[in-house]
Amino acid sequence: MEHDERTHVPVELRAAGVVLLNERGDILLVQEKGIPGHPEKAGLWHIPSGAVEDGENPQDAAVREACEETGLRVRPVKFLGAYLGRFPDGVLILRHVWLAEPEPGQTLAPAFTDEIAEASFVSREDFAQLYAAGQIRMYQTKLFYADALREKGFPALPV
């Protein structure tokens, strides 16, 4: 099969984020307020993440977004993967995700903005309930959380 431009998917937005676990294996999530043009995001939980700026490396963007949304300086330790998603308006997004660790001696200090309402560590059990209730913004968040738990030697998510 020949490949040309018709076989490639045009990505309109690049994003990057981190999965950050505490000493109990709880995941750090941010609750979104929703942004103009995307009211469907309001109240949903997601990993700290955001757009990759022009000329920016996705890993650097993930670190920057984590700090902007949570107040934590983080260090990426493992690339977990990338996935394509589509917003309800049809925009195709490519998101890169890293497992990260916070630099020592910090406390969670989220910078609440017009996009972020809350930031909190969520237990495996509470995550499972949020996911079942449709309160986790993207199903890939569950997959990356499961990968991070395995990587760090924590028990799996409840079924």
Curated annotation (Swiss-Prot):
Keywords: ATP-binding, Hydrolase, Magnesium, Metal-binding, Nucleotide-binding. SUPFAM superfamilies: Nudix. Mg(2+) 2 binds at residues 53, 65. Transmembrane segments: none annotated. Residues 11-144 form the Nudix hydrolase domain. Belongs to the Nudix hydrolase family. This is Nudix hydrolase DR_1025. It comes from Deinococcus radiodurans (strain ATCC 13939 / DSM 20539 / JCM 16871 / CCUG 27074 / LMG 4051 / NBRC 15346 / NCIMB 9279 / VKM B-1422 / R1).
